[in-house]
Amino acid sequence: MTDTAEHFRIETDADNIAWLHFDKSDAGTNVLSQAVLEQLDLHLQQIAAQCPRGLVILSDKSNGFIAGADISSFTKLKTSAEVMGLLETGQTVFNRLEAMPFPTVAMIHGFCLGGGMELALACRYRVTRDDPGTRLGLPEVRLGIHPGWGGSARMVPLIGSIKAMDLILSGRSVDGRTGKRMGLVDRVVPERHLRSTARSMV
């Protein structure tokens, strides 16, 4: 069974696992805008109502998982209320994802940065492709901003304050194997095992 929408596609397989495919329309890279977040929230509510065995979030873009927030949309924010609205939307969506009553897995390849990393941290588990091109991090400081969707708060208890602050304050990214050693991700596997591993985690 499939359900298509502008940026997302839900696939529920024979084992009642929901696969949420992210493929931002008219874009070469997955980024998170206000509209994308609102659509994601609706899909999460729909999936929660279906009570699947688990949820796997993955990207249909060949170049990576999610690059982060849609930076181009920042210039359209004219008031502090609009800024707060974007922050609150992201926090609401990721809190909903974190509170899902079944296992959730971020299936990561390529870049998983900024808001993409924050989304992955809101999942119960994270599995990455074993590839030097896999990059995990919160580079917001390099833009003069701070992670605003709960990523820093979720990262600290996961990997400890020292390692988390190093990543957050430097803005540097790490590959999957380094992320596994730090405790940032749970599994690092070859591409051919990525989907089966994600399935096994739910």
Task: Spell out what each predicted region is.
Residues 57, 70, 119-120, 179:
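Hydrophobic/aromatic residues within transmembrane alpha-helices
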Residues 78-88:
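A short acidic, glycine-rich active-site loop
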Residues 1-23, 169-202:
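Amphipathic alpha-helical segments at domain termini/boundaries
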Residues 79, 160, 190-191:
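Helix-capping/helix-break motifs at membrane-protein junctions
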Residues 15-23, 35-78, 92-109, 129-134:
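A structural preference for short, pocket-lining loop segments at secondary-structure junctions
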Residues 68, 84, 91, 114, ...:
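Glycine-rich phosphate-binding loop at the start of an alpha helix
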Residues 113-168, 182, 198:
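CoA-thioester-processing core
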